[in-house]
Amino acid sequence: MDRNELDPSVPSATEVKKIPLIIKVYAVLCILSGVGTLPSVAAFMWQVITALINGNAAEKLGDNMLVSVGLIVAGIMLSAASAVILIIFGLDLIKNQRRNAARLSYILIAFTVVELLVDVMLQGIGLFLLRPAIQLGILIALSATVDPTLRQERELQRRLQEMLDRDAADEGMLGRDETGEGYIKLNYFNLFWVFLVCCVLGLIAEDIWHMTVDDPGVYQDRAGMLFGPFSPIYGFGAVLMTMVLNRFYKKNPIIIFLVSAVLGASFEVFVGWFMQTSFGVVSWSYSHMKLFGMPDPLAVLTGGRTCTGFACLWGLGGLIWIKLLLPRLLKLINMIPWKSRYSATVIFTVIMLVDGVMTLQSLDYWYQRVNGTEPDIPVAQFYGKYFDNDYMENRFQSMTMSPKDATRV
């Protein structure tokens, strides 16, 4: 051997291998995009400052000017940081520094996801989301392929994991965390089926609650997606609970209860705020809730997006979830036939993605119709024909639409 293959400071044969031309072209585009974004961000920031100084910001930013300004500033800072990282990322690709480029791709993925959320809250759904969405797809692909050593490590780990999964299935431990630190293995397969099952179970539980507590004997469709019996807030909530509480399942029940209460209430507040600022939609409000005969302080503090009683329900739900329901759900998930488990996951992932995208688009065009700003384009006409206001009001019976509550610019 003419060099030490185990020395991390010495590049391996795969790391010395040249970057493909198509990736180099993309690297140049990243650098140009980053360089071009910085002056654009500075110019936009100056426009915002000028509008605030001249006092005409309210006309451009709408009724919720403070929230809009906060989101705009956050978006500007995010865009500036992303531009700088994008330049460095492009240079690393050109210089064949694959491992550094792979690390930066993870940061850019996180920044791009947040950028998408901010754009939706400020402008709704539109073609302007294509650029960050395409960039997100490219970054995800590059993060898995740009560093050959990481790709080889993942392939070896995948093959080893298949062998371990088969052994675990024989021992009745499939899906469990082999380290013993958590209960369930936090992989995409397990978390996706937790999400899907809880979307359905959460909707059933909410319907029962509404018929027995909120409005006895009256059925109301509480679905949260355009198609199917799904309420995604419960699906995402269950995934979040599973990821956070996974290592708490052996802890004191009081600790699990408190962590679940804080986590669930915070999640409920964020989802309510996001839907209201993005689409002017309010699906629930606890502003009327009382605590010992006085206005619930948590409801007052969060603008009615959660309350003390439901925070306690989140706490109790998290405790029941991690102690009783998750183990049984894991057994149910493992009943999916071995040969079809991954193909079934891919098929249902695509179905849920299509449903999710169409749900967001239908909400966006519903908002625009109520606001009187619907564009005269084919996609708007499609949603206006098949998912008009009457359809949306009947489908999302728990939602109220108020465009003035949104932060659209």
Which residues fall in each region the model found?
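Aromatic-rich, lipid-facing transmembrane alpha helices and their immediate juxtamembrane interface loops
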Residues: 2-409
